Structures are given as C-alpha cells and as structure tokens.
C-alpha cells in the first residue's frame, strides 16, 4: 500500500489525474485455484471487500475508478478458447464468470455510491473492449445470433449501470 500511496501522491504533484482500475487480469492465483476465479460468488464477495478497502484508502485522491478492464477477456481465453489453464472449454463456466463480474460491478458501484466515496466529479465504470459482431445476412436467425453475441460479449457489462449514475 505504501507504494501506491507514494505513486498517487507523485501523480497528483505532477498534475496527473490518477485513474484506478481494480482488476486487469490479475486475480490472485490462490483464488483461481481454490474457487475457479469469478465462477465463485465467494470471489465476488472478496472483490467487493477489496474495492471497499481501496475506496477507503484512496477515494480522497482518486476521482476515476474502474471495476474491470476488458472484463470478458480472461474467461474467454480460459473457458471458450481453452488457451490458458485449465485448457478446456466450458461455456457454462464462461457465462458464470460474465454474470459474476457484472454482479461484482453492481455491488461495487453500490458501495461507491452509498459509502460516500465519490468526490466531486468522481466517476465509476468498467473499461469494455467492445467486440463487434455483424450478422452473416438479414435472416432473423442471423440477426438474433449477432444480437446474442453482442449481449454476451458487450452489453452484459454495459447495462450494469443505471441511467441515474454517471458513467466514466
């Protein structure tokens, strides 16, 4: 924590507005081994506690917060592409990770809003790596397939924000 204290202070001293992303692929290995990462509600609970501690410690210095960067990538590489450990495809696990990351985002947003951590002009969001899908043709099935792709890769994370909350 001392490192981050000094780093944030130096950024501010140099006139640089700090932005904090709470997770960018770096879930602790122990949580992955023990719970299969964000497949578990326990990891969601722990992530929300982690976010709350970060808000307590740094909300007086940081206005811009992000729950996740590219929230669909890790589980896609693990459970759809099977490019990372445990090297098998599991679409149910992939969808559970997506759901739990959206759930965690909502829970963290609630903590941020209701905990008084939002300083003037502060914003909270998620950095989405938009995955574009074009329908193969104009048939209803092609249009539906493109819509579902967009839902599972993009909108699941974008729609976690209510219309009354300023997006980052």
At which residue positions do the language-model features occur?
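Non-catalytic scaffold segments within catalytic domains of secreted glycoside hydrolases
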Residues: 1-168
